[in-house]
């Protein structure tokens, strides 16, 4: 059986996360659902160029209320259809924090947070615990966890 995980991450990581996503799906019996792969943004290429927080914040100021609603609704629909959340949180973003919360409290699915500096933050620790997920200091440690669960392909 293939587990479906919502892949939460900041906008600045779109390209590097895509490489990891493909590697993970080839190595493990998981399907990573990347919210940036959908058509919620009018110009995905423009979004890929927003590699700094300053540029991203300036871009967000240009979004209409309708676009904001489309983004949030799309993300929540994806989350609802998943078995869990994998959140890359080394570059914390408001969106990823909301996805962690929604996964744990709204949809009651396991939340796995990968981050170096925040795994002991009360919100991260509690949401991972209450959801039945976990917090990991690296992607490698998360991969080791998936192997222990028997999700590695041989």
Please place each PLM-identified region on the residue numbering.
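Conserved catalytic or regulatory cores that recognize and/or transform ribose-phosphate-containing ligands
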Residues: 1-154
């Amino acid at each position: 059986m293939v587990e479906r995980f919502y892949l939460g991450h900041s906008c600045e990581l779109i390209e590097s996360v895509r490489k990891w996503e493909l590697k993970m799906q080839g190595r493990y019996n998981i399907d990573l659902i990347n919210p940036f792969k959908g058509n919620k943004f009018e110009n995905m290429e423009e979004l890929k160029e927003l590699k700094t927080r300053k540029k991203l914040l300036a871009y967000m100021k240009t979004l209409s209320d309708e676009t904001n609603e489309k983004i949030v609704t799309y993300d929540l629909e994806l989350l609802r259809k998943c078995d869990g959340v994998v959140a890359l949180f080394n570059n914390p973003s408001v969106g990823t924090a909301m996805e962690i919360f929604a996964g744990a409290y709204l949809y009651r699915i396991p939340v796995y947070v990968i981050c170096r500096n925040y795994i002991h933050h009360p919100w991260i620790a509690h949401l991972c615990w209450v959801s039945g997920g976990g917090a990991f200091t690296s992607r490698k440690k998360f991969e080791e966890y998936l192997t222990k669960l028997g999700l590695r392909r041989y």
